Amino acid sequence: MRLLFLVLLVLLGLIQYPLWLGKGGWFKVWDLQRQVAEQRETNDGLRARNTALEAEVRDLATGVGAVEERARSELGMMREGEVFVHILPPGTPLPSGNSTPQASALSKPRPPATPPRR
């Protein structure tokens, strides 16, 4: 009887081995589920980024406003007659010398405006 119990115990152990430690065992399944969850999070972030980029491409392709906004923010461009004002944070030292190219344009007197004709 003891021998039969020992043989059955060994057989049970051999049957359980692939379930827990084998190629498709529970530990492998848990690890793969964790990897799938991480990949889903990555995919969600990339999907959101792609949606934002698609919207930006649509804006750039259809509207002039987006192109103008990008030219202003990234290239520092201005329309004719606009004045660029840069507000420095408190405690920032002032730049030495005249670093504004607009200063000479501001010092020129403007011609008087002519009244509209009727």
From Swiss-Prot:
Residues 95-105 have a biased composition (Polar residues). Residues 22-118 are periplasmic. InterPro entries: Cell_div_FtsB (IPR023081), FtsL/DivIC (IPR007060). GO terms for biological process: FtsZ-dependent cytokinesis. Residues 1-3 are cytoplasmic. Residues 109-118 have a biased composition (Pro residues). Its main location: membrane. GO terms for cellular component: cell division site; cell septum; plasma membrane. Keywords: Cell cycle, Cell division, Cell inner membrane, Cell membrane, Coiled coil, Membrane, Transmembrane, Transmembrane helix. It is found in: Cell inner membrane. The chain crosses the membrane at residues 4-21. It comes from the Bacteria. Disulfide bonds: none annotated. Pfam families: DivIC (PF04977). Residues 88-118 are annotated as: Disordered. Part of a complex composed of FtsB, FtsL and FtsQ. Belongs to the FtsB family. Essential cell division protein. May link together the upstream cell division proteins, which are predominantly cytoplasmic, with the downstream cell division proteins, which are predominantly periplasmic. This is Cell division protein FtsB. It comes from Bordetella parapertussis (strain 12822 / ATCC BAA-587 / NCTC 13253).
